[in-house]
Amino acid sequence: MEAATLPPVFRQEKAPRTRKGVELMEAHIEDLCREYGIELAGSSARGRAIRWRGGKLEISIPPIRGQVSYFIALHEVGHLVGKGRSAPRLESEANAWLFALENSAVEPTSATKRSISRRLEGYLAWARNRQHRRVPPRIPPRDHPFWALLQLS
């Protein structure tokens, strides 16, 4: 089985945006929410995405103060509209991070990549600690991008 690799994921814009820094990242999240019909429902330190019955989409995200909180917001949007939303937990988390990387308006810093990797390591530890259960969480196959995302740091 071949090891997982990530395609080049940073989205290069054809025309550079005029906004910079946090203002650019906030505007990008607002644009995505408008585009996909997602309601920003307050603040959450860790981020949360909810798909309500009737089709209402909602995210709670931390205030965007820098890249890590921006990528958390993109990740939550990815849970609602990205590919692989209904995959098992670890794969769904990886898929949401892939959405964040593919749709970001800024190139991720090494600190952002470390943050993504650490968060996925936490989910992997969670899954490994529950392998004794009657229905254990599924650990992704070796060729899933989950494993390449773990190597970002």
Task: Describe the residue ranges of each PLM region.
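A short, surface-exposed helix-loop junction/capping segment
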Residues: 5-16
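Long, well-structured alpha-helical subdomains associated
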Residues: 10, 21, 65, 106-153
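Active-site scaffold of zinc-dependent metalloenzymes
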Residues: 14-15, 19-22, 30-67, 80-83
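Catalytic Zn2+-binding segment of zinc metalloproteases
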Residues: 62-63, 77-95
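Short alpha-helical catalytic segment bearing the HExxH-like zincin motif
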Residues: 68-76
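An active-site-proximal "capping" alpha-helix that borders the catalytic cofactor pocket
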Residues: 90-106
